[in-house]
């Protein structure tokens, strides 16, 4: 059974635009409990990986892997603070997080 052309046109109108798909992909990363916890920790400002790992009770390399995924999605960024410039701090990219949240709202209505 094939769909009539007007029905297909109506269905296509409800497809998610590519920019929203990209934002929902970023938002989907937050479905992981560790990544959600990381983003919550970063709410108040930059935190280094070693502090996050200790707070989460996770190995540092595991937390680093989660941070890499969040960074690839643009949800977090890195910086170096203080005298010890070897230590990398992570912070949320608030505008990217807002876009991802808005995309979820658009999809879920």
Model-derived segments and spans:
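Conserved segment of winged-helix/HTH DNA-binding domains
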Residues: 88-109
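Short beta-strand "wing" residues that participate in macromolecule-binding interfaces
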Residues: 77-78
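Short, Lys/Arg-enriched N-terminal segment that forms or immediately precedes the first helix
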Residues: 7-27
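Alpha-helical DNA-recognition elements
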Residues: 69
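N-terminal helix-turn-helix DNA-binding core of bacterial DNA-binding proteins
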Residues: 21-59, 83-95
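Residues within the DNA-recognition helix of helix-turn-helix
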Residues: 66
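Glycine-centered, phosphate/nucleic-acid-interacting loop/turn motifs that mediate DNA/RNA or nucleotide
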Residues: 74
């Amino acid at each position: 059974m094939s769909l009539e052309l007007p029905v297909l046109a109506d269905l296509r109108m409800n497809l998610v635009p590519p920019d929203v798909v990209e934002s929902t992909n970023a938002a989907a990363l937050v479905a992981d409990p560790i990544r959600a916890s990381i983003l919550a920790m970063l709410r108040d400002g930059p935190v280094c990986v070693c502090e996050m790992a200790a707070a989460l009770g996770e190995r540092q390399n595991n937390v680093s892997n989660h941070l890499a995924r969040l960074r690839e999605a643009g949800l977090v960024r890195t910086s170096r603070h203080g005298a010890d410039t070897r230590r990398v701090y992570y912070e949320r990219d608030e505008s990217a997080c807002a876009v991802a949240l808005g995309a979820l709202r658009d999809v879920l209505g």
